[in-house]
Amino acid sequence: RLGATRIGHGINLLSDEDTLLRMRDSRFLVEINLISNELLEYVPNLDLHPFPIYLRQGVACCLNTDDRGMWDSNFTDEVFVAVQRFNLSWAEIQKTAYNSYEFSFAEESLKRELVDSFKHDLDIFQKQFSGSNWQTVLAEVPAVTYGYGRNALKLKL
């Protein structure tokens, strides 16, 4: 027992069913770094990344940039890739975001503050986009991408 609660990348977790079940049934998180894993060729094809299996089998996951300076990417790019490649639902996107707070290294009191603030902001966001004019409202939200998003994903933000 190493005492870890967060596992970086976790690409090979699928190869050990006992470990996968322990990750699911205990308080562990897998940090998912899709762009890094693609560029480092940790997976032969990003469509084969185990992330959606982990997420949908109940293993706590969060999205991360890994090394945004090295890969010229940001969190927007990571979320875009996750949604585009794995057809994430809104609930799945929210779950990965909540996990980021729940498994952070912050003190418990700060975690609670951050989660409460996130829930508040998320409620406001959802109310803005729940109406019939959600496309107009969304068009006004500034999104930022770096070179990876522009070049690899062909985003024009």
Where are these regions (language model features)?
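Active-site core of metal-dependent hydrolases
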Residues: 1-41
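Alpha-helix capping and helix-loop boundary segments enriched in small/acidic/polar residues
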Residues: 10-14, 41-45, 69-70, 84, ...
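Anion (oxyanion) recognition and catalysis
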Residues: 24, 55-56
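Charged helix-capping and loop-helix junction motifs
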Residues: 44-52, 78
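Short acidic/histidine-rich active-site segments
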Residues: 59-74
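Short acidic alpha-helix initiation/capping motifs at coil-to-helix transition points
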Residues: 71-77, 91-92
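A short alpha/beta connector and helix-capping loop motif
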Residues: 78-84
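Mid-to-C-terminal alpha-helical segments outside catalytic/metal-binding sites
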Residues: 87-157
